[in-house]
Amino acid sequence: MRVVLAGGGTAGHVEPALALADALRRINPDTQVLCLGTKRGLEQRLVPMRGYELAEIPAVPLPRKLTPQLLSVPGRLANAISTAAKHLDRVQADILVGFGGYVATPGYLAARSRRIPIVVHEANPLPGLANRLGARLTPHVFTGHPHTEIRNGRYIGIPLRTRISNLDRLAVGDKARSKFGLRPDLPTLLIFGGSQGAQAINQAAFDSAEDFYQAGIQVLHVVGPKNADGPEDRTRGGVPYVVVPYVDEMELAYAAADIAMCRSGALTCAELTAVGLPAVFVPLAIGNGEQRLNAEPIVQAGGGLMVANSELSRDWIREHLIPLLTDTDRIVAMSEAAARLGRRDADMALAREVIAIARGERPTPEMPIDYSEESGDTR
């Protein structure tokens, strides 16, 4: 089977696509995978690193408002569609799976022009423009959030790397802490802000360094590649404050931590619940509040806290986060609550759907594919 994946720009688009690719290869090692991407997205690094072919197509941002940029969209979009179609023809694609982002729209339209089956995966509660368009071109639409309102949508979860979905935090916790230069006997806070970091989170954490030292809380702080500054004295009284620009093995960062403080993108929320790591969510106030909607079910279930970006401060951390990190029983309860919301099998579930659709065996809503272990998924 020859599969083309269209999803680039951010980790939230790229990582689920690659997790699906891995699952398809586990089912059939002969599956051919081509990823469509842009010149500037994270896919430039992640796709080759994971062993897949990347084909570039022009990025075509769709303006949300009436601006002069709208005049250039038809010509640029036509060029991107033509480029995507050439790649589909070159690999003789059997199916295209889109995950949103700038490359998804040309991918959907190119596949439609070639009568190639289309699958849409929308990770967020509020679907983006590209996937709303894609959902009009196919009945095969799957969502990462149970309450996403999109045409033909069926909840399936967000595909995750097996390093995340198979992670046993307790089993590898001490090894993970040793890797990052952390002690095995102290409560541990993991701070990160997504692939590029988050200035507000970084600053509030740095401002609170003295409070973490005094409370005996060690910190693993992933600041982002452009934000390598941090407390000058990073270990005090034997309490580490480890600052790193980026972590490729994020599963080890999760294993090292008792609690995370982070943004609440759809992929982040899916990973944290899959591994049962409670979090303080600091939603990025963008778009229609997608990040807040991602975190709300976890917070309501008792698996996390949420604070507005504008309200995060040293005082808030001192009042809410530090007492939590020193309350072992509460951390255990929050971890269990988060884990109850996690879905670890979405990669295999979506892979089976893609295979069935490519073969013309799409199940109806009344006769869904059985994703239980009895159906052959024995990971």
Swiss-Prot record:
Keywords: Cell cycle, Cell division, Cell membrane, Cell shape, Cell wall biogenesis/degradation, Glycosyltransferase, Membrane, Peptidoglycan synthesis, Transferase. InterPro entries: GlcNAc_MurG (IPR006009), Glyco_trans_28_C (IPR007235), GlycoTrans_28_N (IPR004276). Its main location: membrane. It is an enzyme of class 2 (transferase). One of its GO terms (cellular component) is plasma membrane. The lineage of its organism: Bacteria, Bacillati, Actinomycetota, Actinomycetes, Streptosporangiales. Cell wall formation. Catalyzes the transfer of a GlcNAc subunit on undecaprenyl-pyrophosphoryl-MurNAc-pentapeptide (lipid intermediate I) to form undecaprenyl-pyrophosphoryl-MurNAc-(pentapeptide)GlcNAc (lipid intermediate II). This is UDP-N-acetylglucosamine--N-acetylmuramyl-(pentapeptide) pyrophosphoryl-undecaprenol N-acetylglucosamine transferase. GO terms for biological process: carbohydrate metabolic process; cell division; cell wall organization; lipid glycosylation; peptidoglycan biosynthetic process; regulation of cell shape. GO terms for molecular function: UDP-N-acetyl-D-glucosamine:N-acetylmuramoyl-L-alanyl-D-glutamyl-meso-2,6-diaminopimelyl-D-alanyl-D-alanine-diphosphoundecaprenol 4-beta-N-acetylglucosaminlytransferase activity; undecaprenyldiphospho-muramoylpentapeptide beta-N-acetylglucosaminyltransferase activity. Pathway: Cell wall biogenesis; peptidoglycan biosynthesis. It catalyses: di-trans,octa-cis-undecaprenyl diphospho-N-acetyl-alpha-D-muramoyl-L-alanyl-D-glutamyl-meso-2,6-diaminopimeloyl-D-alanyl-D-alanine + UDP-N-acetyl-alpha-D-glucosamine = di-trans,octa-cis-undecaprenyl diphospho-[N-acetyl-alpha-D-glucosaminyl-(1->4)]-N-acetyl-alpha-D-muramoyl-L-alanyl-D-glutamyl-meso-2,6-diaminopimeloyl-D-alanyl-D-alanine + UDP + H(+). Belongs to the glycosyltransferase 28 family. MurG subfamily. It is a peripheral membrane protein. SUPFAM superfamilies: UDP-Glycosyltransferase/glycogen phosphorylase. NCBIfam families: murG (TIGR01133).
